Amino acid sequence: MSSSTNYSGTFTKERFCGGDGFIVEGILQKHNIHTVFLQAKQPLQDTVLPTRYVAITIEFDNAVKRNWKDGVEIPPKMTRATAITKGYLNKFDRVQATLVDKINADQLSVAISDGNKNSSLPSNFHDDAIKNLHPNKKNYFEFWADVDKFSHKIFKSGDEVRIKTIGDSIFVDSVVKMDSNNIANFSGDSNLGDSFASNIMKRYDQIESNNQQQQEEEDDDEWK
């Protein structure tokens, strides 16, 4: 199955891929080949985007902004898990660490649609798909992966996938299937073995749990 678009505007990375980008997780619904036929000359000084894509449709689960430092991607920003003392025995109520830059489906749609209020796709990219995508079909998004880079990827409907976008756009920087054997972390696509939200929570919670245990042991020693 394939589809195509005749596009008469500027189709460059500089035009559509500003911003830090997003990490998006969801359930793969379908994928097909989509071709963009450019009808206008493109700026010579800019980077023209590819014109053949694997169009990946997912049902949105969650998303977070990508985080960078000095041009290197680092894990998303987190609040620290905290322990609040209660009573004279210094018992603790715990406040779990949370992702600072987590976004919902509506926020993602606005960010990647280039101002198109009727769809999560920019105008004239693939208008036939609009009725089947957020916000018209809640939580359904289409992302475009360069055929030359991603056609070898083997996915099927129902797979849980994680997509990193190039800037705040629908264009795919990386995509991985999330299973026990092949799971990507935020910054380096190395094996971790869990979804990104729960994975990073576990790491922060473990650190805070160790700190809390040490504090409780010190408090107990004071009562001996």
Curated annotation (Swiss-Prot):
This is Arpin. It comes from Dictyostelium discoideum (Social amoeba). InterPro entries: Arpin. PANTHER family: ARPIN. Belongs to the Arpin family. Associates with the Arp2/3 complex. The lineage of its organism: Eukaryota, Amoebozoa, Evosea, Eumycetozoa, Dictyostelia. Pfam families: UPF0552 (PF10574). Regulates actin polymerization by inhibiting the actin-nucleating activity of the Arp2/3 complex. Involved in steering cell migration by controlling its directional persistence. One of its GO terms (biological process) is negative regulation of actin nucleation.
